[in-house]
A protein has these predicted regions:
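Polar low-complexity intrinsically disordered regions
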Residues: 1, 66, 204-208
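C-terminal catalytic-base region of ester-bond hydrolases, centering on the histidine
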Residues: 129-208
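Serine-dependent carboxylesterase/thioesterase catalytic core
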Residues: 3-11, 15-20, 24-26, 31-131, ...
């Protein structure tokens, strides 16, 4: 039986935003499942229990942006879940400066909804059994720059430094933007590499 991979989308996005990666995973022989949740109206209180229910059978995870924070929080809240590998795509695991800045603006907190605290606080250092890999981007195209000032390279929404926490099995920076990760062949190659081997192919970081 093929390995299950749960795909988790990010803030303000539908689960269909992960379909491109789902197709690539299925083509590679994986059983891809799209997980959807209400990022603004529902928040982690609803999403984390629903995600945990999907993770009680052996699987891996591919998660974009807020989805990566959500996935690690779910695993940290129930350490025995049989998840082998997690690939995060531009996830602000250290917290998002852009989201924090947006939350301080009039109506900004309402825009982020119940996910505001998750984006602000990020995750604790990773100490779980699953191998977690992070793909960050350094093509600064995105609205995040309007709300927050980034220190160092960023993908337009999340800075590279915001994607680094202790305990990651591997971390790679690719020339892609935050939304570009959703349709990048370069990113897809690295996702498949990590799922298969638990590490990224760093020699291919700049290849098209």
């Amino acid at each position: 039986m093929s390995r299950r991979v749960i795909l988790v989308h990010g803030l303000w996005m539908p689960r269909a935003s992960m379909r491109w990666h789902a197709r690539r995973l299925r083509k590679a022989g994986y059983q891809a499942t799209l997980f959807g949740y209400a990022t603004v109206g529902g928040g982690p209180e609803q999403a984390i229990p629903a995600l945990r229910a999907l993770l009680r059978e052996p699987c891996d995870i591919v998660a974009h942006s807020l989805g990566g924070v959500l996935a690690l929080r779910a695993l940290q809240s129930e350490p025995g879940l049989p998840v082998g590998r997690v690939v995060c795509l531009g996830s602000p695991l250290c917290g998002s400066a852009a989201a924090s800045a947006l939350a301080r603006l009039p109506l900004g907190a309402r825009t982020l909804g119940r996910s505001a605290s998750l984006l602000r606080d990020g995750c604790d250092p990773w100490q779980g059994e699953a191998r977690v890999g992070m793909i960050a981007g350094d093509s600064a195209l995105g609205l995040g720059q309007v709300f927050g000032r980034f220190k160092g390279p960023c993908d337009g929404t999340v800075s590279v430094e915001e994607t680094r926490i202790e305990g990651l099995a591997d971390h790679i920076v690719l020339p892609t933007s935050h939304s570009g990760m959703l349709v990048s062949k370069r990113v897809s190659r690295q996702v498949l590499e990590f799922l298969a081997h638990g590490r990224f192919l760093h020699s291919d970081a700049g290849a098209k």
